[in-house]
């Protein structure tokens, strides 16, 4: 148990070179483009799931917002697949890195905000001052709304990082406790192993839910600006 608790969150290297780019590109292999007239069950299930998520996410958008459909579905597939790959033993989860999550959140948020200021300038500026605000509170509310606008990408990135990191740390701690208790108290080790299995199943759900939540919030920001 001399391994650092946060060792699994350190970017892996190969011959001194970071291999995070290979890890990030690996999910592309999980979603192959169909090359046959008749798809197999896996590809058919993937296409059905993608269409279902896309239909729910694009239902609230106007035609201008629906032009982002390819971007949003690619985002949810990328985050979901990287989260699931991170659950494999001795693997690395890129979404535990706040820098990477900020790299996804800031451009998407900025694109949505710029779209709003470009096509709906008056409506976008009206968000900074709610209707019916007393005159003495106008400067304070403008400052508060401006801060809340710029904190949105940080909230997106921190939420994803915290949820994925917390789950991985719990799995690491319970897994280590199971190994230690195997020689000390086998009945207790069996109990902790059952808890570890249940937690792993929960983490599979969290990996997909967090991908959906991240993409849904980006979609909501886009909806407010289109």
UniProtKB/Swiss-Prot annotation:
This is ATP synthase F(0) complex subunit a. The keyword Transport applies. Keywords: ATP synthesis, CF(0), Hydrogen ion transport, Ion transport, Membrane, Mitochondrion, Mitochondrion inner membrane, Transmembrane, Transmembrane helix, Transport. Subunit a, of the mitochondrial membrane ATP synthase complex (F(1)F(0) ATP synthase or Complex V) that produces ATP from ADP in the presence of a proton gradient across the membrane which is generated by electron transport complexes of the respiratory chain. ATP synthase complex consist of a soluble F(1) head domain - the catalytic core - and a membrane F(1) domain - the membrane proton channel. These two domains are linked by a central stalk rotating inside the F(1) region and a stationary peripheral stalk. Belongs to the ATPase A chain family. One of its GO terms (cellular component) is mitochondrial inner membrane. PROSITE patterns: ATPASE_A. It catalyses: H(+)(in) = H(+)(out). The chain crosses the membrane at residues 6-26, 68-88, 97-117, 138-158, 164-184, 189-209. Pfam families: ATP-synt_A (PF00119). It comes from the Eukaryota. It is found in: Mitochondrion inner membrane. Component of the ATP synthase complex composed at least of ATP5F1A/subunit alpha, ATP5F1B/subunit beta, ATP5MC1/subunit c (homooctomer), MT-ATP6/subunit a, MT-ATP8/subunit 8, ATP5ME/subunit e, ATP5MF/subunit f, ATP5MG/subunit g, ATP5MK/subunit k, ATP5MJ/subunit j, ATP5F1C/subunit gamma, ATP5F1D/subunit delta, ATP5F1E/subunit epsilon, ATP5PF/subunit F6, ATP5PB/subunit b, ATP5PD/subunit d, ATP5PO/subunit OSCP. GO terms for molecular function: proton channel activity; proton-transporting ATP synthase activity, rotational mechanism. It is a multi-pass membrane protein. The keyword Transmembrane applies. GO terms for biological process: proton motive force-driven ATP synthesis; proton motive force-driven mitochondrial ATP synthesis; proton transmembrane transport. It comes from Ictidomys tridecemlineatus. InterPro entries: ATP_synth_F0_asu, ATP_synth_F0_asu_AS, ATP_synth_F0_asu_bact/mt, F0_ATP_A_sf.
């Amino acid at each position: 148990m001399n391994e650092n608790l946060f060792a699994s969150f350190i970017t892996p290297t190969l011959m001194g070179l970071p291999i995070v780019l290979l890890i990030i590109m690996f999910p592309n292999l999980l979603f192959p483009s169909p090359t046959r007239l008749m798809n197999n069950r896996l590809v058919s299930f993937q296409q059905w799931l993608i269409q279902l998520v896309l239909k729910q996410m694009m239902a609230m958008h106007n035609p201008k917002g629906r032009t982002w459909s390819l971007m949003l579905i690619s985002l949810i597939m990328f985050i979901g697949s990287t989260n699931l790959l991170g659950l494999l033993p001795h693997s690395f989860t890129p979404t535990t890195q706040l820098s990477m999550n900020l790299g996804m959140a800031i451009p998407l948020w900025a694109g949505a905000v710029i779209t709003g200021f470009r096509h709906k300038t008056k409506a976008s500026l009206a968000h900074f001052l709610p209707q019916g605000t007393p005159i003495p509170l106008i400067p304070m509310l403008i400052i508060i709304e401006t801060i809340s606008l710029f904190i949105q990408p940080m909230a997106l990135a921190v939420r994803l990082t915290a949820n994925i990191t917390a789950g991985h740390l719990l799995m690491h701690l319970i897994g280590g406790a199971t190994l230690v208790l195997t020689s000390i108290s086998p009945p207790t080790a069996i109990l902790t192993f059952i808890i570890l299995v249940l937690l792993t199943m929960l983490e599979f759900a969290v990996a997909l839910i967090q991908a959906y939540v991240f993409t849904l919030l980006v979609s909501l920001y886009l909806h407010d600006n289109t």
